[in-house]
């Protein structure tokens, strides 16, 4: 049996302000850093150790991984920073307050933009300063692969090649893998692993800074999965994530 650990980054500054973030490179709050440290402590106490780590190229996920590694005394393990693990791109919604956007467009429309499988938000113009074409962290990414908006289907399309080419082979070679990423890149992986339908994925939320453990068989099919931590606190965190896109 293999184990895989997925961790959404701790609370970010724009999580706190209830803003659509996407590829904007915001940092953790003090609460987010504490969540990440607690995740590392829980993993260490549960006997986990890792051989390789994956994360995105956005600092909220990178710093979350640092805190986890620090708590586990595993700062030395190899880390792969992969743009394909970035949060989904929220297009022209980036920076907007979710509740204010819901008040303007309606809860239902914002829920579709946030959680539906195949409906992207309005795209950025290529000349928009929020576009990532000139960002040095994407210098080796073909321009046509750098998004101006994404739906979850698009996120799945960029995450799964990384899974098939790198992550899955690492796991099957016996390496113990941890992935610190984002709500929607993790939803993309969970959708694939658990074979969640396009309709049912709308209801899936991922809490900040909470280790999600998958136990996998030899073919990497899930045997079970569970969150580490206080289950009441996790339920409250999930409810908070679900309510972010509603008008106040």
Curated annotation (Swiss-Prot):
Keywords, alphabetical: Gluconeogenesis, Glycolysis, Isomerase
Residues noted as binding substrate in the record, renumbered to the chain: 8-15, 21-22, 60, 87-90, 98, 114-115, 183-184
GTP-binding is among the record's keywords: no
Catalytic residues of the enzyme: 9, 87
UniProt xrefs under Pfam families: His_Phos_1
SMART domains reported for this sequence: PGAM
UniProt xrefs under PROSITE patterns: PG_MUTASE
UniProt GO MF annotations: phosphoglycerate mutase activity
Record protein name field: 2,3-bisphosphoglycerate-dependent phosphoglycerate mutase
Pathway given in the UniProt record: Carbohydrate degradation; glycolysis; pyruvate from D-glyceraldehyde 3-phosphate: step 3/5
InterPro entries in the cross-refs: His_Pase_superF_clade-1, His_PPase_superfam, PG/BPGM_mutase_AS, Phosphogly_mut1
Family: Belongs to the phosphoglycerate mutase family. BPG-dependent PGAM subfamily.
Role description: Catalyzes the interconversion of 2-phosphoglycerate and 3-phosphoglycerate.
Top-level taxonomic group: Bacteria
Quaternary state and interactors: Homodimer.
Gene3D superfamilies, per the entry: Phosphoglycerate mutase-like
Residues carrying the site annotation Transition state stabilizer: 182
Gene Ontology biological process: gluconeogenesis; glycolytic process
Catalytic activity: (2R)-2-phosphoglycerate = (2R)-3-phosphoglycerate
EC number(s) from the headed UniProt entry: 5.4.2.11
Key word Isomerase present: yes
């Amino acid at each position: 049996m293999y184990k895989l650990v997925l961790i959404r980054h701790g609370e970010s500054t724009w999580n706190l302000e209830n803003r659509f973030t996407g590829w904007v490179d915001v940092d953790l709050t003090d609460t987010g850093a504490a969540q990440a440290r607690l995740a590392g402590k829980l993993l260490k106490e549960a006997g986990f150790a890792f051989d390789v780590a994956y994360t995105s190229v956005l600092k909220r996920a990178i710093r979350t991984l640092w805190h986890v590694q620090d708590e586990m005394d595993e700062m030395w393990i190899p880390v792969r920073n992969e743009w394909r693990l970035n949060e989904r791109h929220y297009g022209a919604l980036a920076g907007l307050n979710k509740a204010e956007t819901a008040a303007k467009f309606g809860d239902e429309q914002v829920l579709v933009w946030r959680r539906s499988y195949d409906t992207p938000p309005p795209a950025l113009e290529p000349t928009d300063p929020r576009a990532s074409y000139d960002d040095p962290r994407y210098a080796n990414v073909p321009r046509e692969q750098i998004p101006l908006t994404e739906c979850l289907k698009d996120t799945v399309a960029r995450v799964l090649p990384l899974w098939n080419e790198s992550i899955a082979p690492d796991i099957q070679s016996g390496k113990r893998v941890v992935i610190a990423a984002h709500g929607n890149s993790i939803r993309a992986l969970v959708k694939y692993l658990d074979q969640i339908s396009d309709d049912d994925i709308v209801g899936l939320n991922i809490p900040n800074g909470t280790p999600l453990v998958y136990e996998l068989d030899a073919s990497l099919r899930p045997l079970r999965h569970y969150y580490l931590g206080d289950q009441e606190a996790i339920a409250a965190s999930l409810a908070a994530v679900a309510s972010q896109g509603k008008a106040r």
